[in-house]
Curated annotation (Swiss-Prot):
Gene: smpB
Example of a GO biological process term: trans-translation
CDD domains xrefs: SmpB (cd09294)
Residue pairs linked by disulfide bridges in the UniProt entry: none
Protein's organism: Halorhodospira halophila (strain DSM 244 / SL1) (Ectothiorhodospira halophila (strain DSM 244 / SL1))
InterPro entries: SmpB, SsrA-bd_prot, SsrA-bd_prot_CS
Biological function: Required for rescue of stalled ribosomes mediated by trans-translation. Binds to transfer-messenger RNA (tmRNA), required for stable association of tmRNA with ribosomes. tmRNA and SmpB together mimic tRNA shape, replacing the anticodon stem-loop with SmpB. tmRNA is encoded by the ssrA gene; the 2 termini fold to resemble tRNA(Ala) and it encodes a 'tag peptide', a short internal open reading frame. During trans-translation Ala-aminoacylated tmRNA acts like a tRNA, entering the A-site of stalled ribosomes, displacing the stalled mRNA.
Name of the protein described by the UniProt record: SsrA-binding protein
Coiled-coil ranges (or none): none
Length: 165
């Protein structure tokens, strides 16, 4: 009989790896394409990410001169981690992408109404990764329709729950 490996049965993506979610992006945008990118971070930022002191809500991605940048992401520094430097919590951070991925982003953003937004920040093999999405902004009526659909799903779940019991 062969021994079963320790990794058997474990899922690759666990909830413990997620640092931050941008839930507002799902409400404000239709996400059409998703990409994974690395982040160029400083030491104090990595420590703050381990403590989950990050906010993606007001951030966006800008492609300038063939490079992708994360703008508006707030990483609050730990008081013990940054004693000899003056950290900037909202500094512009470089995203690490392949050239073809950057070209795809440039082509997507050139279309009218499209933008690139960060969706999720997580750990992968000890490295901080960010999931970005090519998205199109929702109009007010789209947001209302989504809200209505969510309410109906909740109500349906409640009805089914009471019906089964």
């Amino acid at each position: 009989m062969r021994p079963v490996s320790k990794k058997a049965g474990k899922s690759k993506k666990t909830e413990g790896n997620v640092i931050a979610l941008n839930r507002k992006a799902g409400f404000d945008f239709f996400v059409e394409e998703r990409l994974e990118a690395g982040l160029a971070l400083e030491g104090w930022e990595v420590k703050a990410l381990r403590a989950k002191r990050v906010n993606l809500t007001e951030s966006h991605v800008l492609v300038r001169r063939g490079e992708a940048w994360l703008i508006g992401c707030n990483i609050t520094p730990l008081s013990t981690a940054s004693t000899h430097i003056h950290p900037d919590p909202t500094r512009t951070r470089k995203l690490l992408l392949h050239r073809r991925e950057i070209n795809r982003l440039i082509g997507a953003v050139d279309r009218d109404g499209y933008t690139v937004v960060p969706l999720k920040l997580y750990w992968k093999r000890g490295r901080a990764k960010i999931e970005i999405g090519v998205a199109k902004g929702k109009k007010k009526q789209d947001k209302r329709a989504d809200k209505k659909e969510q309410d109906w799903q909740r109500q349906r779940e409640r009805l089914l729950k009471h019906k089964v019991s």
